[in-house]
């Protein structure tokens, strides 16, 4: 399960690309979007069709790029807001396991809603999870909610597999150029920090949008690995808008390689 203590940290993007990485590695993989109040899978995978129902009134997952996909957004049309009480949310959560024909899978990645609500409670009572990954950004508010999520998984005896830090930094690359000025003695500073310049005056700089090291410190506190640090990436954002995971559209991209390493770490845990 891929979880987060709060919304807006990129949990669904992480879950989608992790599932894509496992699929590309040759595993039979499913992705279940359990965020009933705000399903995103129809948009992030560019899917408009509804899932089919077989003769036994069981739902057939939508298949795209060898991924078996299911989301409440496929059923609701992803249009009207969902205003449901806890028991109805719990019932729908169970149906995604009982009434969906997943078939044989190596991995079923669950994209949980943020927080510690009805879906998480239902899973802990009804569905045995092999483990949970918590997604966070490196700022204090998100990290505080990580602790709440970790405590919840601990109480329901679900192993915590690790932490993924999203939006860790922004990679800034450039080159100083001038047609009429000698740049041999020029120095570059960003936020009062001197930036190293190559001989050709090019540079690479990691700009931390939030504080540095938040995810690492939290993973150490929880005694679990920091599985990956995902930089802020325009390519990653655009891939979501296009409805195609970056891991599928450009598996050589530096961010895709991070997702591949996270998938590899999961494979090693479940050999």
Residue spans for each PLM region:
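Residue-level signature of catalytic and energy-coupling elements of molecular machines
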Residues: 7, 33, 41, 70, ...
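Phosphate-binding loop that captures ATP/GTP phosphates
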Residues: 28-84, 90, 97, 216
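Phosphate-binding/switch loop-helix module in NTP-utilizing enzymes
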Residues: 73-123
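C-terminal boundary of histidine-terminating zinc-finger modules
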Residues: 242-255
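Conserved catalytic-core segment of NTP-binding enzymes
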Residues: 106-107, 113-224, 229, 238
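Walker A/P-loop phosphate-binding motif and the immediately C-terminal alpha-helix
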Residues: 1-33
């Amino acid at each position: 399960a891929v979880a987060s203590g709060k919304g807006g940290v990129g949990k669904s993007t992480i879950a989608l690309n992790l599932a894509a990485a496992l699929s590309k590695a040759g595993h039979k993989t499913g992705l279940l979007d359990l965020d009933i109040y705000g399903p995103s899978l129809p948009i992030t995978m560019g899917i408009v069709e509804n899932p089919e129902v077989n003769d036994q009134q069981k739902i057939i997952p939508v298949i795209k790029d060898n991924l078996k996909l299911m989301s409440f957004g496929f059923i609701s049309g992803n249009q009207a807001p969902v205003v449901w009480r806890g028991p109805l949310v719990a019932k729908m959560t169970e149906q995604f396991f009982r009434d969906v024909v997943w078939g044989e899978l190596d991995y079923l990645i669950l994209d949980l809603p943020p927080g510690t609500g009805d879906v998480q409670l239902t899973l802990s009572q009804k569905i045995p999870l092999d483990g949970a990954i918590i997604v966070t950004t490196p700022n204090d508010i998100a990290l505080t909610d990580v602790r709440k999520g970790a405590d919840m998984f601990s109480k329901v005896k679900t192993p915590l597999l690790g932490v993924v830090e999203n939006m860790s930094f922004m990679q800034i690359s450039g080159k100083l150029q001038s047609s009429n000025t000698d740049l041999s003695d020029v120095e570059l500073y960003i936020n009062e920090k001197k930036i190293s310049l190559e001989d050709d005056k090019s540079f690479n700089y990691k700009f931390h949008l939030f504080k540095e090291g938040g995810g690492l410190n939290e993973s150490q506190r929880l005694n679990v690995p920091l599985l990956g640090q995902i930089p802020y990436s325009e390519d990653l954002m655009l891939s979501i808008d296009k409805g195609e995971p970056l891991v599928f559209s450009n598996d050589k991209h530096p961010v895709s390689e991070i997702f591949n390493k996270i998938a590899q770490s999961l494979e090693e845990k479940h050999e």
